[in-house]
Amino acid sequence: MNWPDYSLEEAALRSGARFVAGVDEVGRGPLAGPVTAAAVILDAGCIPEGLNDSKKLTAKRREALAELVMARCDWAVGHASVEEIDRLNILRASHLAMCRAIAGLRQRPCLVLVDGNMLPRDLDLPGQAVVGGDARCLSIAAASILAKLLRDRIMVDLAQQHPGYGWEANAGYPTPAHRQALLDLGVTPYHRRSFAPVHKILCKEETATR
């Protein structure tokens, strides 16, 4: 298995950057819930061992690493709501969540390493897009772990308010069971109306009431 490393952060620090943040988001694909981003500035002297892309970790390992990151590092989380996703589109909402996470850091980064191939439009700091960053860069890997864990917790809470959709297990992603629940139970306030499977159901409901 290839592991992320600290080389991008080290290069920036050698070039004079004082603080380098890694940023990642989770929740672009779900039919329900917010999109969540995290920003992390690692302390080079005490980087938690075992950081990796959150998708490659078990839930137990993810939680243990998240606790270490939150205890040792400067970190923050940002969200964009379902309403913002529907109004802006999912890409812009993801970037909004990233900017909110960066703004929540105690220290202002000199450089932001962003997972993906595009920097947020409203980023007011120097940034570098890193394709596959959660598997390449330790700061981004740490951010991916926090974003995943904290969004999953939100979806567990929402599942208690709206049982039957399986959000505690599927985190709002379009599993067959979630799609069937949409047909059987209908659309909740936490479903993304701009996403095709939800939009189609709403259109059918509107047609049926005419």
Swiss-Prot record:
Enzyme Commission number, as recorded: 3.1.26.4
Gene Ontology BP term (one): DNA replication, removal of RNA primer
Cofactor: Mn(2+); Mg(2+)
Principal location: cytoplasm
Residue span(s) of domain RNase H type-2: 18-207
Catalytic reaction equation(s): Endonucleolytic cleavage to 5'-phosphomonoester
A UniProt-annotated Pfam family: RNase_HII
Taxonomy, superkingdom: Bacteria
Keyword NADP assigned: no
Cross-referenced HAMAP family: RNase_HII_B (MF_00052_B)
Protein's name according to its UniProt entry: Ribonuclease HII
